[in-house]
């Protein structure tokens, strides 16, 4: 073997010498080598179009799945190129999925470039919290820093897609973080120890009447945090002045079906009529909107919207946006009433904007009564759907973190409380006048700005926790990294505060907390009544229903801290008409 290898090497060298002396010194390739200049597709997608093999997967995705026809092919033969029509940023909220689809690396992730190698990353399967859909994702960390978020296949929820915000808001986990307790002295924050802030909190709670204390849970808190927060108020402070709503939203929690997406995300494809009332699913639940488009493309499902919501990526019939129109439809005196009655599986999707109206209770009960009267509630179909926007909303409602007896928000705005305890709540709007505000959270945002004491907590990737998505499915988000500095897990902070106040923890460990929480959820489900007919007590007001949308790229504290989301917002032009409006 050694001899043959040696002889082979000798002959190779001889051939190389002959080629060097007598061979052709120019390439026989006569054609021009193909090279394509890089294309601008926005802050998320880096292009190396010379690699492109013209499979047109990206074009088909943009046209068929995302529903925004902004990619196409120009030229013929070897001159063919994939490009955006106007050489501008892609406008779809699902645009970055083309990175996963591209088989050759012509389209790659711009924010992730040169960050890490795949084999260097720790991979954790978890749940997204950028909206209430609960998309399944994989979080990749390098040295406990989140580097990227990728989709996991779950055919019942997000299929294989995730929104751009889900994928790229993760850099906000490294910015504006609260990493140590703070106390405000003379209008300035100073670092403190945990024992110091706990002692001050204990003193404040003991010197205030229990009726003068209130608490609010935020939109990204997991269920364990919400439950121990509720237990802290019920058992330690002995009051129920707590809520998870940052607005005057109507909620009837006597039945679970009154606040979840009952038809399920998968059920969208089975529906034969979809009626949107005060909802804009493209921005409130991007993945759910892709399902509605899929139902339209595959089944030609009819979509009606009370409001003109702009381009939803599928055609729809829009109405005048008046509550009087809702009233006449669900009193059965409109053509649309007959369409709903004749549909075998209608879907009524109610947005949060409707639930904030003065006549929300009247309209909600009217809609539900109409559907029950016409036998639309069956064993295998529930047509009533609430489109929640935030990851923690349904879980907080399941845990009973709300107060329907008092209007806590009005009392807060009237400055009737002495102590306000905020856990991840950054959406409250009130003029502070002497209240002592305790803020517990992961980022320095609106809540931290008005606080007197800051307790640094953990983000969703830094602690295990359960979230219930808009259709009522409980999913567990797993810990992928650690909180920075002296920050702690949220449930642990509340547990230690209770121990300082009562010399006794609320729960000995997290397993005991989870067990107690699930027992409570079972009891709640047993307590919820089965009501045959909903009573209508509230009065009707004819008013214009305006869809109140958050800024899509800045909808929560993590997104607001993300540099990538800032770039996306800056590159977002007025969305061009794609010819799909109703």
Question: Which role fits each region the language model picked out?
Answer:
Residues 514-582:
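Long, low-complexity segments enriched in small/aliphatic residues
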Residues 9-37, 65-90, 108-130, 140-156, ...:
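Non-heme iron-sulfur electron-transfer modules
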Residues 145-219:
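Catalytic P-loop NTP-binding/switch module of NTPases
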Residues 33-44, 77, 176-187, 270-272, ...:
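Gly-rich Lys/Arg/Thr-decorated short loops/hinges at beta-loop-alpha junctions or inter-strand turns
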């Amino acid at each position: 073997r050694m001899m043959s290898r040696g002889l082979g090497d000798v002959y190779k060298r001889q051939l190389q010498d002959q080629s060097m002396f007598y061979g052709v010194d120019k390439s026989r390739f006569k054609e021009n080598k193909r090279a394509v200049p890089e294309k601008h597709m926005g802050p998320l997608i880096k292009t190396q179009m010379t690699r492109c093999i013209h499979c047109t997967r990206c074009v088909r995705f943009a046209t068929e799945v995302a529903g925004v026809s902004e990619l196409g092919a120009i030229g013929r033969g070897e001159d063919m190129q994939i490009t955006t029509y106007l050489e501008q940023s892609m406008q779809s909220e699902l645009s970055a999925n083309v990175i996963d689809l591209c088989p050759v690396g012509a389209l790659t992730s711009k924010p992730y470039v040169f960050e890490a190698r795949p084999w260097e990353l720790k991979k954790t399967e978890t749940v997204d919290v950028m909206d209430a859909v609960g998309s399944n994702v994989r979080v990749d960390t390098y040295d406990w820093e989140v580097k990227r978020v990728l989709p996991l296949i779950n055919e019942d929820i997000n299929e294989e897609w995730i929104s751009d915000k889900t994928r790229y808001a993760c850099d906000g986990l490294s910015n504006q973080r609260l990493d140590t307790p703070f106390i405000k002295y003379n209008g300035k924050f100073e670092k403190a120890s945990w024992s110091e802030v706990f002692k001050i909190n204990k003193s404040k709670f003991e010197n205030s009447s229990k009726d003068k204390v209130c608490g609010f849970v935020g939109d990204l808190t997991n269920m364990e945090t919400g439950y121990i927060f509720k237990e802290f108020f019920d058992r330690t402070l002995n009051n129920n002045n707590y809520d998870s709503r940052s607005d005057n939203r109507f909620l009837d929690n006597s039945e679970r079906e009154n606040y979840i997406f009952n038809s399920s995300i998968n059920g969208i494809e089975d529906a034969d009529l979809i009626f949107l009332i005060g909802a804009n699913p493209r921005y409130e639940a991007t993945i759910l909107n892709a399902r509605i488009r899929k139902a339209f493309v595959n089944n030609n499902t009819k979509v009606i919207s009370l409001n003109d919501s702009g381009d939803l990526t599928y055609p729809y019939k829009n109405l005048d946006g008046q509550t009087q129109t809702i009233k006449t439809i669900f009193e059965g005196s409109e053509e649309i009433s007959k369409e709903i009655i004749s549909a075998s599986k209608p879907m009524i999707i109610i947005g949060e904007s409707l639930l904030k109206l003065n006549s929300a209770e009247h309209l909600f009960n009217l809609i539900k009564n109409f559907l029950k009267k016409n036998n639309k509630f069956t064993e295998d179909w529930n047509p009533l759907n609430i489109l929640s926007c935030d990851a923690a909303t349904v879980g907080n409602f399941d845990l009973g973190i709300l107060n329907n007896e008092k209007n806590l928000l009005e009392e807060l705005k009237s400055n009737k409380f002495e102590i306000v305890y905020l856990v991840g709540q950054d959406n409250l709007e009130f003029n502070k006048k002497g209240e002592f505000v305790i803020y517990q959270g992961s980022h320095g945002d609106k809540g931290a700005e008005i606080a007197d004491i800051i307790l640094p907590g953990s983000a969703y990737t830094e602690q295990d926790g359960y979230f219930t998505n808009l259709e009522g499915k409980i999913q567990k988000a797993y810990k992928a990294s650690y909180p920075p500095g002296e920050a702690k897990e949220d449930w642990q902070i509340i547990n230690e505060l209770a121990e300082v106040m009562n010399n006794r923890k609320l729960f000995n460990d997290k397993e005991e907390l989870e067990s107690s929480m699930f027992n409570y959820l079972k009891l709640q489900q047993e307590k919820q009544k089965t009501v045959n007919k909903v009573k209508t007590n509230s009065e009707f007001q004819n008013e214009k229903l305006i869809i109140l949308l958050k800024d899509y790229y800045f909808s929560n504290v993590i997104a607001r801290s993300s540099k990538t989301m800032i770039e996306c917002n800056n590159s977002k032009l007025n969305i061009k008409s794609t010819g799909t409006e109703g």
